[in-house]
UniProtKB/Swiss-Prot annotation:
Binding site for Zn(2+) 1: 71, 73, 86, 89
GO cellular component: a single term: DNA-directed RNA polymerase complex
Name the UniProt record assigns to this protein: DNA-directed RNA polymerase subunit beta'
Protein species of origin: Sinorhizobium medicae (strain WSM419)
Spans annotated as Disordered: 1378-1401
């Protein structure tokens, strides 16, 4: 009852609905229209009465009453006087909450520049006035006068005059001949007198005339700002303020502390400062004070307003009493603690609690154990309501008492309330969406939350003291979503790769693995069982053991559902697992008739999920978990020190390697190899030795041994744990029982002396010391990288947040070509893995039989993948989010399968956020895991090619010679060895490095795993193709070549040094020339002379006058020594790729096909030209720093996209030269390589979604008849819209090239300014948006979260869609009514709209 009465007097104002938010510069009139009165005094509250002072910063007359419906002097109290203004104190009688919304203002005695438009770079004021920021500051801060109207004097407009110069000018010309002003008034006058249309016209004509790039850019920037002002309706002089708004007092509160002191918001101090200076200035002007004093006061006023808006942006930071900088208005918005990120994007919520988690193995997958005390607190309101409804209590107070006393009926009611009411569990850090899942609560005693063991992987939780938070979804809709979308039973697959994530781990795996072992000569071997009853009986009586080889009948059903059975050779343990498998013709007994390692269990769950559906999978998982736990317990697997086996051959292997290392030392001492080569070889030798010891150890541990009775001995426990995937890796076993191997220094270099001992033997002091390096680096890395990884995720989410599935099909004919990824002869990602769940772009036919496998536009499913791989198809064109042509978001067909559901993706799925989480989540995982190996190093270098298929060799661009040893050597730069199968279909194609030894020739057959090429990974050779005598050119000792003698060996080597560093060497071009027997320079086969240019650091392998034959090495350039690769290099690498940074020494890529020619050299650059192969193409020239290792020779043929200079290519170059598809495959492969090294599987489509967001902008190359300027960066969508309207009017459309933006830049350039401002550089984004008068249409997720609406994804997306259709429908009906034809004709259109939401737009 009371509630209804209250509602009478306190009507809820209906919430404003709006579709967009616009931001612009406030004019003084606007500020006054917001204001409820001017603030004249700096006082806040009266220190005796604690009432606000009149006209002060908390004035009740301006801002409203302090208590609800009560004026300040107390004359009018209560509701009945609502709306009356008290004649004594002038306060309106109303709600006190108006103090949160009413604003005031301060009339400034002198105008003041707004610091954002002055100092936020690029400065808007200085760009508009076309003056430097320094000059404007001089005028604003009263250092110089500026001439605004020169009259007939010799002064120029906008000329700065110092005090003395001004005085002199006044003396010379007289005071009224010219006008010079100072301070913000001057800038105000100049801005107010600007004619924007005229300026824009002048700028455009000037741009057409100018030729210099720099000037063009400068004019363009200015033109852009001028046009922004014209379009937005802002006036330039509004950037100078004459009125300062004062925010409502309850947003800058003054709180009494105990002890009579007050805590105040910093803003009050800043406002007080402004008011004080303003009042003083007013008085000084009234008193006609001397100019210098007034100027000083004006300057101080300007500074205090600056501090109010953005403290510390200019000059000294204003500090409070305790030397702490005061928080200005800008600081309220900026950064992690600012309004956006602290209060709008991440709020704390009510109805939540947190506690420690413990394991709950007896729970079902959809349940969690909730402590009773916690549940009682969380569900209090529900309990009160139910107590009231059941008549246990009549008032809330009584209900409260009952609950506090914990009466028995309360517990019964709690049970009722909780039943079927899901709660959300969340474990921080929430790295992906599986970090929050819904469960049904089960009440438990104690104070710990019980968590189902199978969901630990998803939460990345363990039970060593982790805590989790519980949240209660309140509304019916929230409960529904929690149940339907977030329930743990609905999240069986991992959104990043589509593999099951509800997988047994640790104990469970060990138990299942133990259960599925098959041993020889066990009791009961060879028995046969017809059903499970017999089997259990035999096991009970110990007639047979779990691991015996038996024959058993497995009962299942066929496709029609009739029972069938078949006899398998298996073990009782496997039969027990088979008993749990759902009966389905597609889930054969073979899925569990094998050793159940973690991988196989995952595959088994995957099979069950794909064929039996979700419900069966959940039941199956629960039963598998129970089985795993019970058998892990019964097996009693444990290990002691004797389980770590040290191989007997270790001593010999170490001895051999030590001898080898001695030999390398000797070679180095004899000068046959350099220091660097020796280092590489030693490291290599020890690396191989470590591997060998590890292999021997594994062989020993794996070995099957029999006891005296001929029964197989039990398996080694450590091996069981590692092999099953329960705990421990071969690497850790190697350190326990093999040898620890090589260690890395913190810099990433490898220490030459390895650790020969293992942990069982114990380390020597030196070894221990060496190993501390790596271990400490691991710990330091972890701390640093966690932060970096989180930041990467944040940037990814920000760039991709508005990528949502908006349509079913965009109908594009573009796509990407997918092929298998082969690395070092191993297939790392088969074509099947890459195309599964994607949509085929073209029809896929079997190349031999010609039968159709997949129709174009259909999704490629598991059976299709098998067929495609069987048919030996090498490349498949698929649709991709990257090439999707929908304007906003992506379409379902281009995206393909929703990995977390295994079905085509739903409308409204937020695929951008999922992609960002999938890429960011492993980043953190990996960085947290670097140190487990204790910094054990691995050398990663490939030096050979192996055939990955059988078939016939075909060599593309064949260019080989036999050298003096009779071995074939590759002399071509773009030679590729292809392997064809018997049908002549290409199975693999691999490029061969220059100088490789080739062991096959055209037409040879190879078998799988056969080596067909190898090379030295540490040096790059320079070889001759003609025979003759060696001569040196410009090889001058001490200038271009240094002969260094190694002290320890007395051997000299000649190495090319940087010859440009000495004055005498600037014009040298060191080269080796081959002359024929007549003493003339030999001719090469392809034309040109046999002159080989040397690059810095090359080591000469020949002497002058030496005879050489084809294929001999003249010189070799060392490559840097192998550094170890781990994700530490990996995470920054991923960030570098997503930020699209140019690598430090980036590769130079050929822009056209053609022949290499050397031109005239510059001082320290070498000029390389490409003569185009086709006519009508301009030759391209490149300048290459002379010292760079440059391996092309005059006359080499090079293809478009080949590297002229090695290194990492810049992604922008790939985009410009080879196009979007090449860029996509480069970025996807490079990023995937980093993750693959760590064994993380991420689906390509996630990376493609992010790359799509990086390619949203276009740079205008031809403006056509549009208003764009060449060089403008515009949104792709915007350009398409403009072009459509231009073409409709019969005008010339504009053209542009796609631009690649890094993720930070792309996030800041989103169409939504709210989203950009909440990401980074808040002040800059808001300044820019205000000048341009931008409108935010609230299309992404972030903007909607910030303004507090449902996000336009998932269920929210559907609501938005319905709302949109409804408005369209209303408009249509109104339109029809207007025409006067009645509403009938609109109905068929509406029906069509309801069926196809896309049409409604």
């Amino acid at each position: 009852m009371n509630q209804e009465v209250m509602n009478l007097f306190n009507p809820q104002v209906p919430a404003q609905t709006f579709d967009s938010i616009r931001i612009s510069i406030a004019s003084p009139e606007k500020i006054l229209s917001w204001s409820y009165g001017e603030i004249k005094k700096p006082e806040t509250i009266n220190y005796r009465t604690f009432k606000p002072e009149r006209d002060g910063l908390f004035c009740a007359r301006i801002f409203g009453p302090i208590k609800d419906y009560e004026c300040l002097c107390g004359k009018y109290k209560r509701m009945k006087y609502k709306g009356i203004i008290c004649e004594k104190c002038g306060v309106e009688v109303t709600l006190s909450r108006v103090r949160r919304e009413r604003m005031g203002h301060i009339e400034l005695a002198a105008p003041v520049a707004h610091i954002w438009f002055l100092k936020s770079l690029p400065s808007r004021i200085s760009t508009l006035l076309d003056m430097t920021l320094k000059d404007i500051e001089r005028v604003l801060y009263f250092e110089n006068y500026i001439v605004t109207e020169p009259g007939l004097t010799s002064l120029k407009e906008n000329q700065l005059l110092s005090e003395e110069e001004y005085m002199i000018a006044v003396d010379e010309f007289g005071e009224d001949q010219f006008t010079a002003m100072i301070g913000a008034e001057a800038i105000y006058e100049m801005l107010a007198s600007m004619n924007l249309e005229k300026i824009a016209g002048d700028l455009r004509s000037e741009m057409a005339e100018t030729t210099s790039d720099l000037k063009q850019k400068k004019l363009m920037k200015r033109l852009k700002i001028v046009e922004n002002f014209m379009e937005s309706g802002n006036r330039p002089e509004w950037m100078i303020m004459k009125v300062v708004p004062v925010i409502p007092p309850d947003l800058r509160p003054l709180v009494p502390l105990d002890g009579g002191r007050f805590a105040t918001s910093d803003l009050n101090d800043l406002y007080r400062r402004v008011i004080n200076r303003n009042n003083r200035l007013k008085r000084l002007i009234e008193l006609r004070a001397p100019g210098i004093i007034i100027r000083n006061e004006k300057r101080m006023l300007q500074e205090s307003v600056d501090a109010l808006f953005d403290n510390g942006r200019r000059g000294r930071v204003i500090t409070g009493a305790n030397k702490r900088p005061l928080k200005s208005l800008s600081d309220m918005l900026k950064g992690k603690q600012g309004r956006f990120r602290q209060n709008l994007l991440g709020k704390r919520v009510d109805y939540s609690g947190r506690s420690v988690i413990v394991t709950g193995p007896e729970l079902k997958l959809h349940q969690c154990g909730l402590p009773k005390k916690m549940a009682l607190e969380l569900f209090k309101p529900f309990i009160y309501a139910r107590l009231d409804a059941k008549g246990y209590s009549s008032t809330v107070k009584q209900a409260k008492k009952l609950v506090e006393k914990e009466k028995p009926e309360v517990w019964d009611i709690l049970d009722e309330v909780i039943r079927e009411h899901p709660v959300l569990l969340n474990r921080a850090p929430t790295l992906h969406r599986l970090g929050i899942q819904a469960f049904e609560p089960i009440l438990v005693e104690g104070k710990a939350i019980q968590l189902h063991p199978l969901v630990c992987t998803a939460f990345n939780a363990d039970f060593d003291g982790d805590q989790m938070a519980v949240h209660v979804p309140l509304s019916l809709e929230a409960q529904l979503e929690a149940r339907v979308l977030m329930m743990s039973t609905n999240n069986i697959l991992h959104p990043a790769n589509g593999a099951p994530i509800i997988v047994p781990s640790q104990d469970m795996v060990l138990g299942l693995y133990y259960l599925s072992i098959m041993n020889q000569n066990e009791p009961g071997e060879g028995m046969a069982f017809s059903d499970m009853g017999e089997l259990h009986h035999a096991l009970e009586t110990k007639a047979v053991t779990l691991h015996a080889k038996i024959r058993g009948r497995y009962k299942t059903v066929d496709a029609e559902g009739n029972p069938v059975s078949k006899i398998y050779e298996t073990t009782p343990g496997r039969m027990i697992i088979g008993e749990l498998l759902p009966k389905n013709p597609n889930v054969p007994f073979e899925t569990c008739n094998q050793e159940m390692t973690k991988k196989n269990i995952s595959k088994m769950i995957d099979t069950v999920y794909r064929h039996c559906g979700q419900k069966d999978t959940v039941i199956f998982c629960d039963r598998i978990m129970q089985l795993g736990f019970s058998h892990a317990c019964r097996a009693g697997i444990s290990f002691g020190k004797d389980d770590m086996v040290i191989p007997d051959t270790k001593v010999k292997i170490v001895g051999d390697t030590e001898a080898l290392v001695k030999e390398y030392e000797q070679q180095y001492n004899d000068g046959l190899i350099t220091q660097g080569e020796k280092y590489n070889k030693v490291v290599d030798a020890w690396g191989k030795a470590t591997e060998k010891v590890a292999e021997e150890m594994m062989a020993r541990i794996k070995a099957v041994e029999f006891d005296d009775s001929g029964r197989q001995k039990p398996m080694n426990s450590i091996y069981m744990m590692s092999h099953s995937g329960a705990r421990g890796s071969p690497n850790q076993m190697r350190q326990l029982g093999g040898m620890r191997g090589l260690m890395a220094k913190p810099s990433g270099e490898i220490i030459e002396t390895p650790i020969i001992s293992n942990f069982k033997e114990g380390l020597t002091v030196n070894e221990y010391f060496n190993s501390t390096h790596g271990a400490r680096k691991g710990l330091a890395d972890t701390a640093l990288k966690t932060a970096n990884s989180g930041y990467l995720t944040r940037r990814l989410v920000d760039v991709a947040q508005d990528c949502i599935v908006t349509h079913t099909d965009c109908g594009t004919d573009k796509g990407l070509t997918m092929t298998a990824i082969v690395d070092a002869g191993q297939v790392v990602a088969s074509i099947g893995q890459r195309i599964l769940g994607r949509t085929a772009l073209d029809n896929i036919d079997n190349p031999v039989t010609g039968e159709r496998i997949v129709d174009a536009g259909r999704m490629i499913l598991e059976p299709d993948v098998v067929a495609i791989e069987k048919a030996g198809i090498q490349s498949v064109r698929i649709r991709s989010a990257l090439t999707c042509e929908i304007q906003t978001g992506v379409c379902g067909v281009c995206y393909g399968r929703d990995l977390a559901r295994g079905t085509p993706v739903n409308m409204g799925e937020a695929v951008g956020v999922i992609a960002a989480q999938s890429i960011g989540e492993p980043g953190t995982q990996l960085t947290m895991r670097t140190f487990h190996l204790g910094g054990t190093a691995t050398v990663v270098d490939q030096s050979f090619l192996e055939a990955s298929y059988e078939g016939t060799v075909q060599i593309k661009n064949r260019n080989m010679l036999r050298n003096s040893d009779g071995v074939l050597v590759a002399m071509g730069r773009n030679m590729a060895i292809q392997i064809l199968d018997e049908r002549g279909v290409e199975r693999s194609s691999q490029r061969v490095a220059y100088g490789s030894k080739i062991f096959v020739d055209d037409g040879d057959t190879v078998r799988r795993g056969q080596r067909f090429a190898e090379w030295d990974p540490y040096t790059r050779p320079m070889m001759t193709e003609v025979e003759g005598t060696v001569h040196f050119e410009d090889v001058v000792d001490g200038i271009s070549v240094l002969e260094s003698t190694d002290e320890s060996t007395g051997i000299t080597k000649r190495q090319v040094i940087d010859w440009r560093s000495t004055p005498r060497g600037t014009d040298l071009k060191p080269a080796i020339v081959i002359k024929d027997k007549n003493g003339n320079i030999a001719k090469l086969a392809r034309g040109g002379e046999a002159r080989f240019m040397l690059s810095v650091d090359a080591i000469l392998s020949v002497e002058p006058g030496q005879k050489v034959s084809q294929g001999d090495v003249l010189a070799r350039s060392p490559l840097e020594s192998a550094k170890t690769k781990d994700i530490t290099g990996g995470l920054p690498r991923v960030a570098e790729l997503f930020e699209a940074r140019r690598p430090k020494d980036h590769a130079i890529i050929a822009e056209i096909d053609g022949t290499i020619r050397f031109g005239r050299d510059y001082k320290n650059k070498r000029r390389v030209m490409i003569e185009p192969a086709e006519d009508g193409v301009e030759p391209v020239e490149y300048l290459i720093p002379k010292g760079k290792p440059f391996h092309l020779q005059d006359g080499d043929y090079i293809e478009k996209g080949d590297y002229i200079l090695d290194g990492n290519p810049a992604p922008h170059d790939i985009l410009a030269i080879k196009g979007v598809e090449a860029l996509a495959s480069y970025l996807v492969n490079e990023i995937q390589e980093v993750y693959r090294l760590q064994g993380v599987v991420i689906n390509d489509k996630h990376i493609e979604v992010i790359v799509r967001q990086m390619l949203q902008k276009v740079e205008i190359t031809d403006a056509g008849d549009s208003t764009y300027i060449v060089g403008d960066n515009v949104d792709r969508i915007e350009l398409e819209d403009v072009n459509d309207s231009l073409i409709a009017e019969g005008k010339k459309p504009a053209f542009g090239d796609p631009v690649l933006l890094g993720i930070t830049k792309a996030s800041l350039q989103t169409p939504s300014f709210i989203s950009a401002a909440s990401f980074q550089e808040t002040t800059k984004v808001l300044t820019e948006a205000a000048v341009a008068g931008k409108t935010d249409n609230l299309q992404g997720l972030k903007e909607n979260v910030i303004v507090g609406r449902l996000i336009p994804a998932g269920t929210g997306g559907t609501m938005t869609q319905i709302r949109r259709i409804a408005t369209a429908r209303d408009e249509l009906i109104l339109e029809e009514r207007r025409k006067g034809t009645g509403a009938e004709s609109a109905t068929p259109m509406l029906a069509a709209m309801a069926n196809d939401p896309a049409a409604a737009e």
